[in-house]
Amino acid sequence: MSKLWGGRFTEEAEAWVEEFGASISFDQQLVNQDINGSMAHVTMLAKQGIVTQEEAEKIKIGLQYLLKEAKENKLQFSVEAEDIHLNIEKMLIEQIGEVGGKLHTGRSRNDQVATDMHLYLKEKVEHIIKATKQLQTVLVHQAENNIETIMPGYTHLQRAQPISFAHHILAYFWMLERDVNRYEDSLKRINISPLGAGALAGTTFPIDREYSAELLGFNGIYENSLDAVSDRDFILEFLSNSSMLMMHLSRFCEELILWSSQEFQFIEMSDQYATGSSIMPQKKNPDMAELIRGKTGRVYGNLFSLLTVMKGLPLAYNKDLQEDKEGMFDTVKTVEGCLHIMAGMLETMTVNKEKMGQAVTQDFSNATEIADYLANKGLPFRQAHEIVGKLVLYCTQKGIYLLDVSLETYKEMSSLFEEDLYEVLSPYAAVKRRNSAGGTGFEQIKNALEKAKGLTKEVIKG
């Protein structure tokens, strides 16, 4: 097959060389964006008198036919045509004749592929934002049902202070909100058009870049043609934002895995999101949570891969940039899948409130309450800390907990202890009292839930 760019060449490449250089196996995912970009481009060419209205109409009819065929998965792509751009152009010329060759006037594959990827990511980032907000609504529902569910809060994976389970869940809500904000902000940089930048230096044709950008729904154009065709910051930013999101999902999955174990028993995964063992009949494995945790490394890898590709590229376009797509496609698929699985997993899990409650009565997570009690009576906090440390040591030596210590023993440690001490030792009271802004107190959680509902109200309505 003769190449659309083959005029300068006298020898054909070996088949294996063609296959090595071709990208159609993966960039065919850009077929809709490629055709839509071409529709805008030819409309602009006609407006500017670069092609006739009759020619433009014929080209658009051909493109509309190809778009219909693409949506029905009827297009047959060839490695010989290398990539999505030349495949579509070849099909167009076969469909409508040589006038199809006028489509590429005033355009290069360099600005064409960049335009395709801007259009693709704009659509996919909007989908991911919506999916993240749907996950946030699940967190809100779980938090509403567990405001007064008391569990241990941890530092160093050691029980630290009693908290509300809702407070723990809402911590992830706010992490995801930052992820949403990052994605939304990135749309400002995704939503600009490189179309018309040409190979690197613009074009001699009197094109109207602003018009084609407007037709495609972009908010503006790249100000520099070299930058337009060589920029992949918008993909790197997407991969970075996605790595951050996946890190948050992975952290939560790690906790879900721990909590579902026999050692914790704080939650039970729905059978829909767990699997068994081929040899051990008793097993119920949190495979979906483990997969999300594992796939996080995959997204990190896609980010570092493209950073490494980009670090040594001179301006403007280089064939290395063909390596920008597979990691992007893979990350989109991975993130969308993980968000969907995570939402279902959290929505269907069972919370073992009794086990959580037992965990905060058979530990020393209420020790800080005693230190605060003494500090409120005027004792310097460092002295209070020392006294409570000795009390904990006393309890561990006796095999008892702070609630089991007699008032007489407390008074031996400090004369400031009174009968009201036992009121603050209750995990429920400890949580309720921590009512500072952003704290785990029940009133603070209710305030946080109202704010969270306000941020997801459009999703809830939908």
Curated annotation (Swiss-Prot):
GO MF: argininosuccinate lyase activity
An example Gene Ontology biological process: arginine biosynthetic process via ornithine
Gene3D superfamilies attached to this UniProt entry: Fumarase/aspartase (C-terminal domain), Fumarase/aspartase (Central domain), Fumarase/aspartase (N-terminal domain)
Pathway this chain belongs to: Amino-acid biosynthesis; L-arginine biosynthesis; L-arginine from L-ornithine and carbamoyl phosphate: step 3/3
Annotated PROSITE patterns: FUMARATE_LYASES (PS00163)
Keyword Amino-acid biosynthesis recorded: yes
Species name: Bacillus cereus (strain B4264)
Keywords, in A-Z order: Amino-acid biosynthesis, Arginine biosynthesis, Cytoplasm, Lyase
SUPFAM superfamilies according to UniProt: L-aspartase-like
Entry protein name: Argininosuccinate lyase
Uppermost EC category: lyase
Reaction catalyzed: 2-(N(omega)-L-arginino)succinate = fumarate + L-arginine
